[in-house]
Swiss-Prot record:
GO terms for biological process: amino acid metabolic process. SUPFAM superfamilies: Bacterial exopeptidase dimerisation domain, Zn-dependent exopeptidases. Its EC number is 3.5.1.14. Its main location: cytoplasm. The gene is ACY1. Expression is highest in kidney, strong in brain and weaker in placenta and spleen. One of its GO terms (molecular function) is aminoacylase activity. This is Aminoacylase-1. It is linked to Aminoacylase-1 deficiency: An enzymatic deficiency resulting in encephalopathy, unspecific psychomotor delay, psychomotor delay with atrophy of the vermis and syringomyelia, marked muscular hypotonia or normal clinical features. Epileptic seizures are a frequent feature. All affected individuals exhibit markedly increased urinary excretion of several N-acetylated amino acids. Changing residue 353 to C: In ACY1D; loss of activity. Belongs to the peptidase M20A family. It comes from Homo sapiens (Human). Binds 2 Zn(2+) ions per subunit. Gene3D superfamilies: 1.10.150.900, 3.30.70.360, Zn peptidases. Zn(2+) 1 binds at residues 80, 113, 175.
């Protein structure tokens, strides 16, 4: 694949690169510039534009293309505006220049995660409007802040507000991930993030002595139990070629804390873990297992949750789901191979599904290495434009799904 020269660049690519240059990078994203960008785009496309401040400085921008039948539920196209930090010294090009090389690869933070999808939504709508189309169902595009740090000042708040309920969303699309093969990954559920801190208390003393009942000994037992569970899940994944990473529960030890000096046995030590719990796990039983590992380690060992998502939802991927039927039929007609999976990490889709809206995670990037959050994140312009083509076919099908019992 080779690149067109600047004078021949596709206008959709130009808009994509313009958006990539907006520095919505954590921890201090320029959300104001992103909101202004979408306001201007809405004006150009003749779309309704609503700004909802869900927390001070955190604005959800909603662009609306009204359908012909307001009694039907709407299609929600969601994307987040923030991107993760960069280490510029490890990049071949400025991560906020949106540099395009001679082969057509666009280097930028957010190229895959997920500014490409935001512009693909907009450009598909632009194309359909220019062609004179209208569809029964209203299409809303939501551009939300804060996803990369948990969405707690973004979609988590937005779904609780009357402005969200007024959208009457019947089905949603949000981000997926690149796929290095010919296939396209589509996520129908997500693992639940549990951030767990285990604290162990014990006898302090001089570090030259063999003390009993120390905090470190008891914490060591819990760490061993959790890492043994990790190995068991890893082996289960490795031994079954039909399982994907999202189908098992992962855990990583991410932080160890304790101690004040080399020669002092600490009275308190702690270990922090990031669990991603598969949706088919019995959450109550799993929490009891964690508690039992702490109890088995001895007295004075406790756990607390920094994050604990308890609402796993699965969007059906069979013909019992009319949204999936419409989505998959278009992909079949376009000769796109789909690989339905459980999202290993967490996205804003978990908040959308939790309020009863079926949702899929889909970023149309096949034959593309997975580079989200990585150095030299990039996307080929041809892959990006193919994504616009795909949404241009998907949106009419989704927005034309016949009336459903849930619409009332």
């Amino acid at each position: 694949m080779t690149s067109k020269g600047p004078e021949e660049e596709h206008p959709s690519v130009t808009l994509f690169r313009q958006y990539l240059r907006i520095r919505t990078v954590q921890p201090k994203p320029d959300y104001g510039a992103a909101v202004a960008f979408f306001e201007e785009t809405a004006r150009q496309l003749g779309l309704g534009c609503q700004k909802v401040e869900v927390a001070p400085g955190y604005v959800v921008t909603v662009l609306t293309w009204p359908g012909t039948n307001p009694t039907l539920s709407s299609i929600l196209l969601n994307s987040h505006t923030d991107v993760v930090p960069v280490f510029k010294e490890h990049w071949s090009h400025d991560p906020f220049e949106a540099f395009k090389d001679s082969e057509g690869y666009i280097y930028a933070r957010g190229a895959q995660d997920m500014k490409c999808v935001s512009i693909q939504y907009l450009e598909a709508v632009r194309r359909l409007k220019v062609e004179g189309h209208r569809f029964p169902r209203t299409i809303h595009m939501t551009f939300v802040p804060d996803e990369e740090v948990g969405g707690h000042q973004g979609m988590e708040l937005f779904v609780q507000r009357p402005e969200f309920h007024a959208l009457r969303a019947g089905f949603a699309l949000d981000e997926g991930i690149a796929n290095p093969t010919d296939a396209f990954t589509v996520f129908y559920s997500e693992r639940s993030p549990w951030w767990v801190r285990v604290t162990s208390t014990g006898r302090p003393g001089h570090a030259s002595r063999f003390m009993e009942d120390t905090a470190a000994e008891k914490l060591h037992k819990v760490v061993n139990s959790i890492l043994a569970f990790r190995e068991k899940e890893w082996q289960r994944l490795q031994s079954n070629p039909h399982l994907k990473e999202g189908s098992v529960t992962s855990v990583n030890l991410t932080k160890l804390e304790g101690g004040v000096a080399y020669n002092v046995i600490p009275a308190t030590m702690s270990a922090s873990f990031d669990f991603r719990v598969a949706p088919d796990v019995d959450f109550k039983a799993f929490e009891e297992q964690l508690q039992s590992w702490c109890q088995a380690a001895g007295e004075g060992v406790t756990l607390e949750f920094a994050q604990k998502w308890m609402h796993p939802q699965v969007t059906p991927t069979d013909d019992s789901n009319p949204w999936w039927a419409a989505f998959s039929r278009v992909c079949k007609d376009m000769n796109l191979t789909l690989e339905p999976e459980i999202m290993p990490a967490a996205t804003d889709n978990r908040y959308i599904r939790a309020v009863g809206v079926p949702a899929l995670g889909f970023s149309p990037m096949n034959r593309t290495p997975v580079l989200l959050h990585d150095h030299d994140e990039r996307l080929h312009e041809a892959v990006f434009l193919r994504g616009v083509d795909i949404y241009t076919r998907l949106l009419p099908a989704l927005a034309s799904v016949p009336a459903l019992p849930s619409d009332s």
